[in-house]
Amino acid sequence: MALQGNLFGDAEPASSAPSKGQKRQDEPDQLDDHELTQDAKQRPRQRQGQQEHSEPSASSQSEEAHSEASTPAGKDQDNSDDDLPPWSHHSQVTPEQLTPMLRHYVELKAAHPERILLYRLGDFFECFFEDAIHLSRLLELTLTGKEAGKQIGRVPMAGIPHHAAERYCSELIRRGLSVALCDQLEAAPASGSAKGTLLRRDITRVLTPGTVLEEGLLSARRNNWLAAVVVEPAQGRQPFRWGLACADVSTGEFLVREQDNSAALHQELARLDPAELIHHNQNSVAPSWCPERLQRCDIGNTPFSQPEAEALLLERFRLQTLDGLGLQNVPLAMRAAGGLIAYLGETCPLDDNGITPPPLERPITCFPGDALVLDAQTRRNLELIATQRDNQFQGSLLWAIDRTLTAMGARCLRRWIEAPLMDPSIIRSRQASVSQLVSKRPLRQALRRLLRPMGDLERLAGRAGAGHAGARDLVAIADGLERLPQLANLITSQLDGGPSWLSDVLEPDPALAVIGASIRHQLMDNPPLSLSEGGLIHDGVDPLLDGLRNQLDDQESWLAEQEQLERQSSNNSNLKLQYHRTFGYFLSVSRARSGAVPDHWIRRQTLANEERFITPDLKAREGQIFQMRARAAQREYELFCELRGQIGEHAEAIRRSARAIAGLDALTSLAEAAATGGWCAPEITADRSMVIEQGRHPVVEQLLVEDAFTPNDSNLGTGIDLVVLTGPNASGKSCYLRQIGLIQLLAQIGSWVPAQAARIGIADRIFTRVGAVDDLAAGQSTFMVEMAETANILHHASERSLVLLDEIGRGTATFDGLSIAWAVSEHLAGDLQARTVFATHYHELNALAGERSNVANCQVLVEETGSDLVFLHRVAAGGASRSYGIEAARLAGVPASVVQRARQVLDQLAT
């Protein structure tokens, strides 16, 4: 079995059967388990302090360095197809003509044609045929060849060192590719054994973008969603309907949803941004509801039927009935969940040792109306997760408020931003917790000190449950579990009440304390990364292991005695008995003294300044020590696997506490941002009001270094539904629009907001149309993109929506554009009565305020000082009459002659 604690790591320590013969204390490999246990009782081992894991004897480092067989390709490398052999694809060869190893490779490749197959050969993962060509080009590796049989000759081969496989696989996963790992399931035979026997190998892991568990392959601060979709196209009066299931196998979260409307599916997929999407698609063309950049994996030739899905769900969650899952009214979502579980079964199958697929929690059904709706355009315009210009984290809303200290807290805060709340009671409860943490600075700081060193318990528990956790993962789990009582004491002693979901921190499962204590009792505090070389388990844990260690101590004593004896026999006080990983134990003497060694010494190696020898006794004892050490390492691995299995059984309880800790971390982050930024707690109302006093942009305010941000008021929904905002170019109108949208969103995640005071009603959707670009690939001009976005708003906005418009109609003739802008404004203020701020350079729209009582005019002020224009960035009542476009052009660096000519043309047009 390949070690599950280190995906690309060591082979399982091979146990050695004791040889026959007389049993003596100095030949412990011949002792049975009972005698070793008795030895441990007679000579009990005392628990030692943490020691560095090192080689078992005095060592001299290897002078040789192995070169990697697959190195970055040089400039003279030519990977053109003309140089490839005719069998550059595995399907072109006859398996019977291949060597046994390559025949096995082709069989596995035929079962995984869509994945890159990495086949373990010694210290390398190799691939052949088309995968070798693909891998060499993707990773810039040397493309070489391997003899495949007399009738075939050489076939393409490329490979990567097994110790660097995680780095290379990470790059492949990042590119959206899937990888099948074929590892050795048994140790290589000892030297001198019969050659030509094919080692047992099989697929041990399938790595896909949506199913990876390894820390190095995941982004710590965001969920890694695997999504499955089942759709029913519109037929007659039946609308388009879809079911969605998404799971993060690294954290165990499992969500399902069912709804009408393909646009809603597109929005949900854009919000989740899954790493991988699986669905049934009978066409080669991607469906319109699927964002183009998502990695798709078509499943099967037939959609999953409801009976198949029900059977898979019952088996997965070990249920007799699905009534408790609440999926009866969402049949498409149930089928999607079944497809997702079937895909996990293919990529994470049960192995011979009972290693289970990643543990998932029971699915939670999400309903329309649970969260504020944000379409993809609004997410981009408000720059929630990344900036619009260069897609960078710095400069986004999440960057501005993320003070989280744990990876799970960062993911939680991101989820809050991506799905703001709609339930006023939940919003107020979360806001009350933030308020308490703001007012209690010592408590907030104490909580943050405890949270800072905490590991990612959510994902650590998942790896333990899937049998992939290493020893250091388990130690990190113990560290986190030990902090639960400290967090609980702080909260109960200083926080009045607290949210109900904090109960998993205040009253954790009692079994978690037992788990933490068991890890501390058994595992070293700083265990090695490798699970196959010992150094994992404390003394005093297992009598059999203690007995083996006693015998190893005896052998170390024998080696020390032997060194003294050989010094005396050779009359050489500088002689050293040393150990080398490759050459084993040897006697080292200087070249000058090498001619006067005893006759029974056997020369083993000659170096520049020393000679290395062995003796028959030393060689015999070396074999015994190696066998004994292998038995001890095997026993440590068995004990570790037992412990990991016990922890995996409690993965769900660990995750519950981890989710509570994540929420606590997110709350302290919001409190820290509010306390340090001078924010206020908004009043959440049941009406449509949005009254903001001295509001500020939460991101721009932090980015300003020299100048102070100019705060502004906003008033919507209290008699005014539409504000027509006019003012010069580059005066800050777009910033003001985004500021309003971000304050609305912050209020609905339960956060404080950057303002002096605020009263905010719940919005069902936020729409933005800020700036426009063409979409040439889709055959749409800038104006058509603008009109499509406007149409989407007019079709879906309601009186509880917040609409933020920055210029409509500017991409066509002036009067056409003005007419469109006027009609859109009337529709928003009249038919929809949606809360709207419309920034425009069509000053004619100021007349709407005289026609409709729910329309008001505002302007961004500027100050003219001679020929200069000073932007005040202050919003005031009333409409502007000029846009100062020529002055803005001058400030942007347009040549003076062009600016002067523009003024002349403007004067001519004005007359």
Swiss-Prot record:
Disulfide bond sites: none
PROSITE patterns registered for this protein in UniProt: DNA_MISMATCH_REPAIR_2 (PS00486)
Listed GO biological process terms: mismatch repair
Similarity comment: family membership: Belongs to the DNA mismatch repair MutS family.
SMART domains: MUTSac, MUTSd
Region (Disordered): 1-95
Name of this protein: DNA mismatch repair protein MutS
One MF annotation (Gene Ontology) recorded for this entry: damaged DNA binding
Alphabetized CDD domains for the sequence: ABC_MutS1
Source domain of life: Bacteria
Residues that coordinate or bind ATP: G727, P728, N729, A730, S731, G732, K733, S734
Keywords attached to this entry: ATP-binding, DNA damage, DNA repair, DNA-binding, Nucleotide-binding
GO CC annotation, single: cytosol
Record field: compositional bias (Basic and acidic residues): 23-42
The protein's role, per its UniProt record: This protein is involved in the repair of mismatches in DNA. It is possible that it carries out the mismatch recognition step. This protein has a weak ATPase activity.
Entries under HAMAP family matching the protein: MutS
InterPro entries associated with the record: DNA_mismatch_repair_MutS, DNA_mismatch_repair_MutS-lik_N, DNA_mismatch_repair_MutS/MSH, DNA_mismatch_repair_MutS_C, DNA_mismatch_repair_MutS_clamp, DNA_mismatch_repair_MutS_core, DNA_mismatch_repair_MutS_N, DNA_mismatch_repair_MutS_sf
